[in-house]
Amino acid sequence: MTNIRKRHPLIKIVNESFIDLPTPPNISDWWNFGSLLGVCLVLQILTGLFLAMHYTSDTMTAFSSVTHICRDVNYGWIIRYIHANGASMFFICLFMHVGRGMYYGSYLFMETWNIGILLLFTVMATAFMGYVLPWGQMSFWGATVITNLLSAIPYIGTSLVEWIWGGFSVDKATLTRFFAFHFILPFIISALAVVHLLFLHGTGSNNPSGISSDSDKIPFHPYYTIMEILGLLTMLAMLMILVVFSPDLLGDPDNYTPANPLNTPPHIKPEWYFLFAYAILRSIPNKLGGVLALILSIMILAITPLLHTSNQRSMTFRPLSQCLFWLLVADLLTLTWIGGQPVEHPFIIIGQLASILYFSIILIFMPISGTIENQLLKW
């Protein structure tokens, strides 16, 4: 008689996805981040659900309802800080996951990669709307500045911004709809994540060598479940250290001041995980040009499969491409730092140079290095 996990219609799906899944024998810790993202998503949905029970999406009471959650609700403070810092962990795992995909050539699984880009955009939209909800100074002004970027679209820009705002400025209507979208989007993300997994399990996982491992696969459990649990415990430990010891480390002090439309903060900036894109936006003096560069900074991921010129899939044995990859990582860290600095000399020129380098590495240098490496292999 077959085991229940192999014959029950529902348990069978779980079994084929997480237990008996044929997995390459040589995947490293870099393959952990997919499951960590799943855990982050569940954590965010659960903590968000409890926060939504006490939060009110009204401009008059939003700020005080967050204060009420932290002061009066049982363990409200820890739920709120797990949710806020959980978003940061989510993005750390996201960036690592995308970086892993770029390094090991996982972008050649086109369907999985494109769903991943869609997921990235959806998560970014969700995080942005969540940042607006506490209705502090930076929430309000961040929402005003970022949504106002759409006014750069010719002809329909101004009408589009007013339509999103639900009026002539960021106000009650904006906050209410942002809360509604922030609540529903994580469930859409969950559905997209299932599609992402579906496409991945259609092709099987990539591995560090970039060579097919079909003849040599091993079951996911117990070999990789142990590794996943270690990664999970490490991430949860880091998250809880952050939550308990310095919960406001990654936040903005201005958000402890209630939103005031009459008083602009000296330096408006989004959360840290958007700073690299914000720096690219600010590095172009023209408004429409800046918005296009902002969108392209993420959309450029969609054309990476077309820019793959190497005969090898992975960067494991490609030293030139490795140097460029780590230069790209350093460049992104520089952009993140610049995004948090005021718009003045020397930060303006550093931001512009870093933005040019970002696009140059992906569009020009990476394809050239792949071609050079192909030639070197012939020697």
Curated annotation (Swiss-Prot):
Binds 2 heme b groups non-covalently. One of its GO terms (biological process) is mitochondrial electron transport, ubiquinol to cytochrome c. The cytochrome bc1 complex contains 11 subunits: 3 respiratory subunits (MT-CYB, CYC1 and UQCRFS1), 2 core proteins (UQCRC1 and UQCRC2) and 6 low-molecular weight proteins (UQCRH/QCR6, UQCRB/QCR7, UQCRQ/QCR8, UQCR10/QCR9, UQCR11/QCR10 and a cleavage product of UQCRFS1). This cytochrome bc1 complex then forms a dimer. One of its GO terms (molecular function) is metal ion binding. Heme 1 (or BL or b562) is low-potential and absorbs at about 562 nm, and heme 2 (or BH or b566) is high-potential and absorbs at about 566 nm. One of its GO terms (cellular component) is mitochondrial inner membrane. It is a multi-pass membrane protein. Belongs to the cytochrome b family. Heme b b566 binds at residues 97, 196. Component of the ubiquinol-cytochrome c reductase complex (complex III or cytochrome b-c1 complex) that is part of the mitochondrial respiratory chain. The b-c1 complex mediates electron transfer from ubiquinol to cytochrome c. Contributes to the generation of a proton gradient across the mitochondrial membrane that is then used for ATP synthesis. It is found in: Mitochondrion inner membrane. PROSITE patterns: CYTB_CTER, CYTB_NTER. Its cofactor is heme b. This is Cytochrome b. A ubiquinone binds at residue 201. Heme b b562 binds at residues 83, 182. The chain crosses the membrane at residues 33-53, 77-98, 113-133, 178-198, 226-246, 288-308, 320-340, 347-367. Pfam families: Cytochrom_B_C, Cytochrome_B. Keywords: Electron transport, Heme, Iron, Membrane, Metal-binding, Mitochondrion, Mitochondrion inner membrane, Respiratory chain, Transmembrane, Transmembrane helix, Transport, Ubiquinone. InterPro entries: Cyt_b/b6_C, Cyt_b/b6_C_sf, Cyt_b/b6_N, Cytb/b6-like_sf, Cytochrome_b, Cytochrome_b_C_euk/bac, Cytochrome_b_N_euk/bac, Di-haem_cyt_TM.
